[in-house]
A protein has these predicted regions:
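Expand to "…catalyze enediolate/carbanion chemistry for C-C bond making/breaking, isomerization
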Residues: 1-142
Length: 142
């Protein structure tokens, strides 16, 4: 379970991801949203869920960027409508529409670049990132 953000830009992050991870992001965003609607079980206490808690609208924006890039690469997407509906619901609920405070934190994004390099070194080497491939994830949770 992970939402990869090698960049503070959702669209740029989507463009950077390999197909395997890009496709999974859409599904994992849905799983995180569903987990946030529960009080126990599943992924409720996973750090990826906790870091987006209170920022559901931004998670949907991130997911939309993943869906757009997925379609741009020629794949079919069946999740964009789910995220659009969720945004409407969250706006109606008065949820926080602002980006999370960790977006733009260089140590956070560097940890994601590092882990992407570890997972698929041949693919991610093209970006010339300076991070070593062994940094731990930075989980911005309390």
């Amino acid at each position: 379970m992970q939402t990869f953000l090698p960049s503070p830009s959702y669209a740029e992050s989507a463009r950077m991801l390999d197909n395997r991870r890009l496709g999974k992001q859409r599904v994992e965003c849905k799983q995180i949203l569903l987990a946030m609607s529960k009080t126990s079980g599943g992924w409720v206490n996973h750090p990826a869920t906790k870091m987006w808690r209170g920022h559901e609208i931004e998670l949907c924006r991130y997911a939309h960027a993943m869906c757009r890039e997925w379609v741009q690469r020629g794949y079919k997407d069946n999740l964009a409508v789910f995220f659009a509906d969720a945004v409407l619901q969250f706006h109606g609920d008065g949820r926080n529409p602002y980006p999370p405070p960790w977006l733009g934190d260089e140590s956070f994004h560097a940890s994601h670049r590092s882990n992407l390099l570890r997972k698929a070194p041949d693919y991610y080497a093209r970006y010339g990132w300076s991070e070593p491939a062994d940094l731990p994830y930075v989980w911005p949770i309390q």
